[in-house]
Amino acid sequence: MGPRTNHRQSKTLLVLTLLGLLGAVGAAIANEPQETAPMGHNQSQPPPLVQENKTIKVSEHVYAIPDGRVNLVPNIGIIVGSRATLIVDAGMGPRNGQTVVRELAKVSKNTDLYFTTTHFHPEHMTGVQAFPANTIVIRPEAQQEEVDRKQPEFIHNFSQRTADLKALLQDVKPRPPDILFDHEAKLDLGGVTVRLVWLGPAHTRGDNNIFVVEDGVLFTGDVVINRFFPIFPDADASGKNWLSILDQLDEFHPRTIVPGHGEVGDASLISKERTYLKAVQSRVVELKAQGKSSEETAQLLLVEFRAKYPDWENPGWIADAAKRFYIEAK
């Protein structure tokens, strides 16, 4: 399937090549855990605000606004070429998007702007409303399908959780994409090549992996996070595919990983995520073979893996991972 574009593409100095290189991955099966909001937040925690004046230089062409380990704040990327700039994720709602725009102005003077999202969850996507009107939005078709099918419900559910979230998401308006791609898009920002790659369902159905070729920097979204337990938020998350995708991310040979949440790190973040998920998968298979129910398995693993990973945050997601692998186990 080729790209879908509108007239705004004619204004760009960016060269876009769409590559149908990777086979689509099958959908997650039915009878799944209940949909829940990712990266828990309650009123006792800091409000999920993108940090101002904290932007770091990750590599020659890449900057990141770190999340400060605040739930529902993503790591945000700014990739600067000689002709155009690509922004990766936007924070929750227009207020956070305005912060991103101010930080962007400190590191790039380009007026040609592109925006992509690692996945559809509100803290990654809804800040784009505050971006300049000429910003070109690009994302995978699989991700847009999730936006259309799920995002209104996610925004509503987030808004009901705390006063902070309700205020941030008030009057949020969807920003439709200008470019959709099926499996891969390649962007030339001017001396900087960026690959946007959809590999199939993992954390969500539409996870978008962004690789800055010259700098060896990989933005993984929530497919890889640093010292947070991996999040299985709804019926489209797939443990089996997630493990396969981690293997494929290794093939990029990244030097630096900008995870969806948590500190920027090196390629070892991929192997750490893999080690955890494989351990959960293996233990689930063992307990299911012993006749344990899904709920019994989830509660046993919650205790076991909290003890094994005492410095990882949001342990409530252990049970959801266990239930996912239980469904997938033969």
Q: How would you describe each model-predicted region?
A:
Residues 2-16:
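Bacterial N-terminal signal peptides that target proteins for export
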Residues 16-22, 26-83:
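Zn-dependent metallo-beta-lactamase
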Residues 22, 28-45, 251-253, 264-330:
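Accessory terminal helices/loops
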Residues 50, 57, 84-86, 90-94, 145-279, ...:
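Metallo-beta-lactamase
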Residues 55-103, 208-222:
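Conserved beta-strand hairpin/beta-sheet module of binuclear metal-dependent hydrolase folds
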Residues 61, 79, 89, 104, ...:
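Divalent metal-coordination and catalytic microenvironments
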